[in-house]
């Protein structure tokens, strides 16, 4: 019995098998994976929601004190 799940590539809709050895899953190929990355980078893909006012973003100082150096 074959229990491997068939999925469609989110970019080209090509059917492929969800397998641990598919390094590009859920995409069918490196090409489709890079197309998706490019769409996120160019902001043609976004998570819907309200815009955030940059002035309201709280920043933190992540520097750690180096106690051992004296």
Curated annotation (Swiss-Prot):
Listed GO biological process terms:
regulation of DNA-templated transcription
Its keywords, alphabetically, are: Metal-binding, Zinc
State how the cofactor is bound: Binds 1 zinc ion.
Quaternary structure and partners: Interacts with GyrB.
* Family statement drawn from the similarity comment of this UniProt entry: Belongs to the DNA gyrase inhibitor YacG family.
Its function? Inhibits all the catalytic activities of DNA gyrase by preventing its interaction with DNA. Acts by binding directly to the C-terminal domain of GyrB, which probably disrupts DNA binding by the gyrase.
> What protein name does the entry list?
DNA gyrase inhibitor YacG
């Amino acid at each position: 019995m074959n229990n491997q799940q068939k999925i469609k590539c989110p970019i080209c809709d090509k059917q492929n098998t969800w397998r641990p050895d598919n390094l590009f899953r859920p995409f069918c190929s490196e090409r489709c994976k890079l197309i998706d990355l490019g769409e996120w980078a160019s902001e043609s893909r976004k998570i819907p929601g309200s815009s955030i006012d940059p002035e309201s973003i709280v920043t933190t100082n992540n520097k750690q004190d180096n106690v051992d150096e004296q």
